[in-house]
Structures are given as structure tokens and as C-alpha cells.
């Protein structure tokens, strides 16, 4: 099965960002992609770089016109879309990703682990996610999501693997020359859980902050299953064979050889 990561920048014009995303979905679908993922908070500029209450106006409800545009694109192109966005839900705000399956909202993941770092003031804007770690049953396979910092906490990906995920999308908004760190972390998660993990990173300049892209898909043997992207807008293609996942799981047996009775300290 062919999947794609849409590595793109996002500016202050939300409508333009939406239109660009929809356009790139069509191109990815023409290339044969059946599942298409986007970077973290892909519809907005990188507002968490500082604390600014006026930026809450950038949030969208799941029922908003912006999200509906991607629902329509999912129907038109008959694809599954993993769309990260700034979510407004009643009086709470989340760093979220909606999974759209050929026009159907398959579900929503809300980022669990929120950094509070220079240029990443996420705890000011977002409530920690309350969705736990769902696996979305779609027409193109079982999909999990771990948003940016979530991927540096291995428990989430392990839960997704235990619950039957075939693919984990890892949308990020990474800068500051951290590519080597992310390549190691994502590849290790893919290998330790014998599944596919697609890291889709943001690109572009945003108020002095540079996002470097370099998106890639790691496979269940710890290998690269896509070309490593550059630092410009791009569509990254990966061709997956689920037999590879099954073979890796059978060979290494990480999940079936676990010893949960010995892991009590991890939740203290």
C-alpha cells in the first residue's frame, strides 16, 4: 500500500493553508497514495513560539469549514487523511489530529505530552489530551497517531502496537537542528514495536524560526522505507508491505515476549 506525508509550510492566511493542503492531497492521490498525513498544527502559523492570548482565535472545531474542506477532499480522492490542527472543543483547546476515512470522521487524537520549552510554549495553549491512545479502524488499515513530543515517550507507541496499529503517523513541528535525534527516536519506535512510523515534519520560516522538514517513514525492521525529504514543501511517498510487519513481529517477538508482571514501576 502506498502512503504519503505532505511536508508543507503554513502561514498566517488559514484559507490559503487549507487550499494548499487540499491541492497537495490531490497530487498525492494521483501518485497512488491511499493514506496521507500532514505535519503538526498544519493549518496555522507556529503560534506556540510565545504566549499570546490572541492566538486562541486560530483554533477550529471539528465541524468547522476548514476541516470540512479536508473531508470533501477525502471523499473526492478516496483517501484516508491524518490532519493535525488546533482544536477548540467547548471551552478547551487541544493539539489534535483528526483521522478522515473517505469522508467519514474515523476519530480524533489529542496530544498527551505537552512541552514547555523556549519557542514551544504548548502548555499555555493546550489541555493535555484525554483520548488516550486510540487505534483508528479505516478502510486502509489500522492507524495510530503520536504528535511530535509524544514520540519521545515510548509508552504511547507501544500501546498502539499492542492494540493492533499497522501504521503510526508522527506529525511534528521540529526545528533547531534536531533531525538526527528524531531519526533515532522514530526508527527505534518502529523497530521496537515492529510497525511503520511516518514522521511528517513542518517546513518553512515562521517569525524567525526555521522548520527543516526531512520527513521519512521507518519500517518494522528499523529500516527506512521512504526517501528522506529535504527542507522544502514536498510529498514524501512510502510503499508499505504489511507482510514485512508480520515477518518482523514473528522474527523478533517483542510484543509476545513482554513480561508485564515485571513492569509495575513504570506507572508509579
PLM region descriptions:
Residues 83-85, 96-99, 134, 199, ...:
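Short beta-strand scaffold segments in enzyme catalytic cores
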Residues 1-4:
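Extreme N-terminal starter segment of soluble prokaryotic enzymes
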Residues 60, 88-163, 175-184, 250-252, ...:
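Active-site catalytic loop in hydrolytic enzyme cores
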Residues 14, 23-102, 106-108, 175-188, ...:
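Cys-nucleophile CN-hydrolase/nitrilase-fold catalytic domain and related Cys-dependent amidase chemistry
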Residues 243-268:
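A conserved C-terminal secondary-structure "cap"
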Residues 7-14:
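Short polar catalytic/cofactor-binding loops
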Residues 59, 65-80, 152-235:
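CN hydrolase (nitrilase-like) catalytic-core segments centered on the catalytic cysteine
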Residues 96, 108-110, 170, 227, ...:
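Residue-level detector of high-confidence beta-strand sites
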